[in-house]
């Protein structure tokens, strides 16, 4: 049985890195007494994979990992067992069964993610910026310097900003998140304010990831669906 588990990560645990989060869930799965499948060979390990690493210091309401079990268990039972052993700040939201070959691996499916960007108290720029987002997006190109392993290169990130708008006091954005075009919300935020002539101070804002999506569309039109929606509940 292959399942996709959705969880949130808020509060102080946002400072726990990706590898430590993986290790934490491995221990939690044991405490939850789930019949997890292991790989073969001299060094067997749990068959699990996370969808998209979350940056240190970023909260999230929509994180995912896939897990192989050797028995079929109701998905609601898996959610309950895991959530009961979570630390404060981590909440298991749902479990869905996914089929190999149909839904694919969570990591390879990731195409987009959406975020909230919110200024910390007293850190919001004093200039008028709220009505400038549409003008920013109206540019045919948004060129930035992006670091690679060996150097820097100029790229156009405009095609990777699928949506950006003001929602209340927060900036909402949906960005490309596939490995080939992964676009950080920090990069978009800093580029926007730099375009306005403002250099934001360090730690001026917080970021919360809201959801992660696969793209079931084609080259002409995107059709984003949540990774959760690609699975189904099992009674």
Question: Can you describe what each PLM-predicted range is?
Answer:
Residues 78-86, 128-137, 188:
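Short amphipathic alpha-helices in soluble, non-transmembrane regions
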Residues 61-116:
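Ordered, amphipathic secondary-structure segments that act as subunit-interaction surfaces
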């Amino acid at each position: 049985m292959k399942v996709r588990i959705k969880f949130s990560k808020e509060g102080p645990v946002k400072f726990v890195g990706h590898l430590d989060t993986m290790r934490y869930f491995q221990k939690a799965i044991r405490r939850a007494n789930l019949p997890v499948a292991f790989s073969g060979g001299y060094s067997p390990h749990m068959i699990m994979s996370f969808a998209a690493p979350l940056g240190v210091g970023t909260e999230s309401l929509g994180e995912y990992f896939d897990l192989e079990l050797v028995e079929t268990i109701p998905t609601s039972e898996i959610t309950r067992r895991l959530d009961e052993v979570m630390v404060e700040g981590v909440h298991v939201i749902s479990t869905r069964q996914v089929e190999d070959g149909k839904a694919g691996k969570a990591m390879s499916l990731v195409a987009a993610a959406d975020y909230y960007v919110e200024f910390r108290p007293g850190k919001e720029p004093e200039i008028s910026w709220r009505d400038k987002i549409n003008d920013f997006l109206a540019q045919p190109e948004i060129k930035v310097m992006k670091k690679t392993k060996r150097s820097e290169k100029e790229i156009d990130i405009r095609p990777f900003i699928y949506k950006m708008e003001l929602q209340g006091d927060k900036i909402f954005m949906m960005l490309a998140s596939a490995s080939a075009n992964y676009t950080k919300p920090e990069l978009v935020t800093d580029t926007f304010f730099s375009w306005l002539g403002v250099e934001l101070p360090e730690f001026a804002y917080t970021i919360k990831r809201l959801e992660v999506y696969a793209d079931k569309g084609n080259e002409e039109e995107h059709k984003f669906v949540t990774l959760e929606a690609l699975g189904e509940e099992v009674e």
